[in-house]
């Protein structure tokens, strides 16, 4: 017999559904104290931490490779200063969507219940063309909205000068091996799924090398290791196992999609870091994907 619907059952169902979220999403930091990396920006006494602690957020652009915490940092800032938060993806939004969200921001700015200016976060802002970027200028200049843009491309080439003159650019760096080690430890001890499993960390060289300073990529690899063993088997992190699993399970690659740019970035970082194994792997991913 089907169990009757109750609010209790519904809440449990929603809670269970969160267990199917990707590991990277389950571990997304909610505060600056949980944020890993970018100490030059969010460490004690550094520019972004001082800005957040003061509550006075000015418009800025976060420039860095994929998986280094650009989106997470923007969300943390909005929570810390208790500001209305709107987000747009430049890949899927046009001038109409920009104008619609700016109208909402204007309404929030004039509300007696809003203490701080609304924050508009635009991911992949370099994908906006000139007219789309122009549509932001008035709201930014008048203080209707605080703009936070995220880009993997050099803003000097991709962002129009009038917008750059109104927004400071902050550079985010790939995560170091120490950062990745801290993230790995957090995943194994804090994640509701992984902390119930037996995990044997024997070697981390391959895990960190294939991650290329990208937190999301490392957590996705860890997720793959978890999914590739039975529930009663231990999860073993060792160089040969990591390499074998990645070769057996090439992730989806869409040369016209966002993953295309993530993989190109990983390939370039592997070459620059003199990691031939990782470079060959990411090159093979691109060739196989067309």
Predicted regions and their residues:
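Pre-Walker A (pre-P-loop) alpha-helix and adjacent loop at the N terminus of AAA/AAA+ ATPase modules
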Residues: 19-60, 104
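Short glycine-rich substrate-engagement loop in P-loop NTPases that contacts/grips substrate
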Residues: 43-45, 85-118
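Walker A/P-loop
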Residues: 50-88, 137-138
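Conserved AAA+ ATPase "SRH/arginine-finger" region at the nucleotide-binding site
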Residues: 89, 168-181
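Short regulatory helix/loop adjacent to the ATP-binding pocket of P-loop NTPases
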Residues: 137-138, 154-166
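Conserved AAA+ ATPase "sensor/coupling" helix adjacent to the nucleotide-binding pocket
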Residues: 166, 179-195, 224-228
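C-terminal helical "lid" of AAA+/P-loop NTPase domains
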Residues: 205-210, 216-231, 243, 265-269, ...
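C-terminal engagement/docking regions of AAA+ P-loop ATPases
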Residues: 238-290
